[in-house]
């Protein structure tokens, strides 16, 4: 996620940064007061940072092989506390970005699962409708056609006509035999 692209994300990041500053200040104060914290946690990174910074500056200016004096303990403790505070702010901000990324990925995964479920439901519905269509087509083919019905109707009328004629002639013969 690019922080510059979304104003809300940028505001959120700045808010987290502002909230983490008091935490960083407390860590800095604890680093300045505690001998153990100062000696083992603040001084080594500060001296390393000072050494890398001075070495880089010397190389840029063209000086080679110059020994770099370490910082005095007070300056190193101050620099170490500042580095620790900035690292805390960076870690909190980075953690927020990672959590936002995970949240976005979870939302994306859920959205894809919903789409997949909807797709499967649509495929099932299409399959069910295809079976219903086949059943209706089979019923339509099993039904006699209109021309067959017309033929049956004509045959029925012929039979009726024959029955009527036979019935009428038998009545006529019966009536004539009674006379």
Curated annotation (Swiss-Prot):
InterPro entries: OPA3-like. Keywords: Coiled coil, Mitochondrion. Belongs to the OPA3 family. PANTHER family: OPTIC ATROPHY 3 PROTEIN, OPTIC ATROPHY 3 PROTEIN OPA3. The gene is Opa3. One of its GO terms (cellular component) is mitochondrion. Residues 120-143 form a coiled coil. GO terms for biological process: bone development; fat cell differentiation; mitochondrion organization; neuromuscular process; regulation of growth; regulation of lipid metabolic process; visual perception. May play some role in mitochondrial processes. It comes from the Eukaryota. It is found in: Mitochondrion. Changing residue 122 to P: Homozygous mice have their visual function which is severely reduced, consistent with significant loss of retinal ganglion cells and degeneration of axons in the optic nerve. The keyword Coiled coil applies. This is Optic atrophy 3 protein homolog. Pfam families: OPA3. The keyword Coiled coil applies.
């Amino acid at each position: 996620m690019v922080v510059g692209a979304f104003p809300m994300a940028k505001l959120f990041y700045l808010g987290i940064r502002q909230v983490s500053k008091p935490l960083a200040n407390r860590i800095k104060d604890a680093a300045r007061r505690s001998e153990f914290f100062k000696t083992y946690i603040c001084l080594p990174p500060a001296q390393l940072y000072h050494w890398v910074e001075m070495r880089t500056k010397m190389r840029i200016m063209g000086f080679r092989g110059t020994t770099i004096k370490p910082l005095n303990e007070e300056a190193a403790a101050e620099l170490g506390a500042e580095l620790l505070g900035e690292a805390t702010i960076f870690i909190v901000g980075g953690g927020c970005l990672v959590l936002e990324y995970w949240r976005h990925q979870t939302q994306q995964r859920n959205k894809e699962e919903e789409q997949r479920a909807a797709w499967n439901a649509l495929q099932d519905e299409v399959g069910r409708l295809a079976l219903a269509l086949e059943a209706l087509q089979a019923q339509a083919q099993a039904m006699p056609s209109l021309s067959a019905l017309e033929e049956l109707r004509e045959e029925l009328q012929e039979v009726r006509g024959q029955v009527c004629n036979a019935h009428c002639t038998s009545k006529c013969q019966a009536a004539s035999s009674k006379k």
